[in-house]
């Protein structure tokens, strides 16, 4: 199951704009770019542990919500239930995109993971952690802090991985362009030599 083409193209364009290294003037020829793996082991390990931590976070959040539900004002009841539902839905999508983007080195999926983490998950969990009106219990604070640490680490490591992936793709493009130009120059030389012989 892959992202629809318009979404992939927009995320690809976004990631090329944000993550490409503008200081580079040309491709680097240090290593063979076709053989280099750019997926991040640290990000993958974080995603792996996050998949096991998230059910624990969810169960503890539901239990703590049930314990303090009667003392919360009505608007906080609605807000907290909505946030937990949103975090649950977003987390499933986010982890899927993170796995696909990192393991298969797909830039649009990893960019989607990064955007969901930075723009949706992190603000929601920070709201749950720092809002004084929610009267957070100690277990709740502990699991929110751990989840925030996971998210912060994943945002930073996904950014670095995306930057590396985009630079590798740019290098591949420049090398293919160079090879194509070299081949066309060779063809032109052959045509010139044939014309000169005639």
UniProtKB/Swiss-Prot annotation:
Organism of provenance: Bos taurus (Bovine)
Membrane-protein topology: Multi-pass membrane protein
Glycosylation sites: 13, 23
Cellular localization per UniProt: Cell projection, Cilium membrane
Segments traversing the membrane: 45-65, 78-98, 110-130, 142-162
Superkingdom of the source species: Eukaryota
One Pfam family it belongs to: Transmemb_17
Keywords per UniProt: Cell membrane, Cell projection, Cilium, Cilium biogenesis/degradation, Glycoprotein, Membrane, Transmembrane, Transmembrane helix
GO cellular component: ciliary membrane; ciliary transition zone; MKS complex
Keyword Transmembrane helix: yes
Stored InterPro entries: Uncharacterised_TM-17
Complexes and interactors: Part of the tectonic-like complex (also named B9 complex).
Protein name according to UniProt: Transmembrane protein 17
Function: Transmembrane component of the tectonic-like complex, a complex localized at the transition zone of primary cilia and acting as a barrier that prevents diffusion of transmembrane proteins between the cilia and plasma membranes. Required for ciliogenesis and sonic hedgehog/SHH signaling.
GO biological process: cilium assembly; non-motile cilium assembly; smoothened signaling pathway
Gene from which the chain derives: TMEM17
Family: Belongs to the TMEM17 family.
């Amino acid at each position: 199951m892959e992202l629809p083409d318009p979404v992939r193209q927009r995320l690809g364009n976004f990631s090329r704009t944000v993550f490409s290294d503008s200081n580079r003037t040309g491709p680097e020829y240090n290593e063979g770019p076709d053989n280099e793996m750019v997926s991040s082991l640290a990000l993958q390990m974080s995603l792996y542990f996050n998949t096991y931590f998230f059910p624990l976070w969810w169960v503890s959040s539901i239990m703590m919500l049930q314990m303090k539900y009667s003392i919360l004002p009505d608007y906080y009841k609605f807000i907290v239930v909505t946030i937990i539902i949103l975090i649950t839905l977003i987390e499933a999508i986010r982890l899927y995109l993170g796995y696909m983007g990192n393991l298969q080195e797909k830039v649009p999926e990893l960019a989607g993971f990064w955007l969901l983490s930075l723009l949706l998950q992190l603000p929601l969990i920070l709201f749950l952690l720092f809002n004084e009106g929610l009267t957070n219990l100690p277990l709740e604070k502990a699991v929110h802090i751990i989840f925030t640490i996971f998210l912060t680490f994943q945002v930073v490591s996904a950014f670095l991985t995306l930057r590396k992936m985009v630079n590798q793709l740019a290098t591949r493009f420049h090398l293919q362009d160079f090879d194509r130009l070299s081949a066309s120059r060779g063809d032109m030389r052959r045509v010139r030599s044939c014309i000169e012989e005639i």
